[in-house]
């Protein structure tokens, strides 16, 4: 809430796993056209770099970053060069296999924290995101 009133802040309600998809707003519902508040924000401010943080590294953060990379690569944000993931400001959850089974969940519900965090970072970096341990010098 402390940032909500700042003139350089754009708040986008996140109502789905992928914040980029959640930022799509229908303009003319009858015509199926829309715009995206993330793209609008990057373009309005002519941003060259965005920094992404959040929970869960391998789910929400990764989906948003990979979609932003694709949108950038398709020239939807002409000034955007770098999408940075600040690793210390990202995290994910731990759900050991035994706990998943005890809860009556399928084995596929298991979510080993260290491995899935690493996998999320790996996939983002392999597609072009910059992984950073600090923001100094960016």
Please give the residue ranges for each predicted region:
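Active-site-adjacent betaalpha module
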Residues: 1-138
């Amino acid at each position: 809430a402390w940032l909500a009133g700042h003139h350089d802040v754009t708040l986008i309600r996140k109502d789905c796993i992928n914040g980029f998809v959640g930022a799509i707003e229908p303009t003319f519902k009858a015509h199926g056209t829309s715009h995206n508040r993330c793209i609008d924000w990057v373009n309005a401010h002519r941003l060259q770099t965005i920094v992404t943080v959040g929970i869960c590294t391998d789910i929400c953060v990764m989906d948003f970053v990979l979609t932003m990379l694709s949108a950038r690569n398709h020239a939807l944000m002409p000034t955007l060069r770098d999408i940075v993931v600040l690793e210390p400001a990202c995290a994910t959850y731990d759900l050991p296999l035994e706990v998943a089974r005890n809860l009556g969940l399928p084995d596929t519900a298991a979510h080993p924290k260290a491995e899935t965090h690493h996998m999320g970072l790996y996939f983002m970096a392999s597609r072009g995101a910059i992984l950073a341990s600090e923001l100094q010098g960016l």
